[in-house]
Amino acid sequence: MNNKTEMGSSTSGNCSSVSTTGLANSGSESDLRQRDLIDERKRKRKQSNRESARRSRMRKQKHLDDLTAQVTHLRKENAQIVAGIAVTTQHYVTIEAENDILRAQVLELNHRLQSLNEIVDFVESSSSGFGMETGQGLFDGGLFDGVMNPMNLGFYNQPIMASASTAGDVFNC
């Protein structure tokens, strides 16, 4: 735009060229002011972008720190859960071993009960024929006095002892 104005002024003469140059100078000054204004805006925008990038980096760093703290917390929580599972598993194994022992005791006691019931049935069915002629009962010096004497039944009151390893080997549970 300045070139056209200067061309037109150079064809018209010296006087008009001075006034045109003055206009051109004032145009240059406004252009300079405009450029300065644009440069100032660019500087402000760059500074604003730098601040925005800094804030963004800070947000990202804070987010990373938060995630790192969360990972640490979750790992600690996971370790506690794993430890709890180990304790629970140990309790389970212990209780299972105790249950195996109790099952073995139940089997033995059922066997003893069955044997005693068979003896009682035999004694009741046989009581009419043995010892009646002599006046002796079966339990007062008669045939079964040695078997049914409470003093001879002491071994029945002994606790059944089984170890966890033998119970596991026997039952394979």
Curated annotation (Swiss-Prot):
Q: Which organism is it from?
A: Arabidopsis thaliana (Mouse-ear cress)
Tissue specificity note: Expressed in the micropylar endosperm and radicle tip in early germinating seeds.
Q: Which UniProt keywords apply?
A: DNA-binding, Nucleus, Transcription, Transcription regulation
Its domain of life reads Eukaryota
Positions with biased composition (Low complexity): 8-22
> What are the record's GO terms for cellular component?
nucleus
What is the protein name given in its UniProt record?
bZIP transcription factor 44
Annotated segments matching region Disordered: 1-65
Q: Which InterPro entries match?
A: bZIP, bZIP_plant_GBF1, bZIP_sf
Give positions of region: Leucine-zipper.
Answer: 67-81
GO annotation terms (biological process): seed germination
Pfam families per record: bZIP_1 (PF00170)
- The UniProt regions of compositional bias labelled Basic and acidic residues, in chain numbering, are 30-41
Name the gene: BZIP44
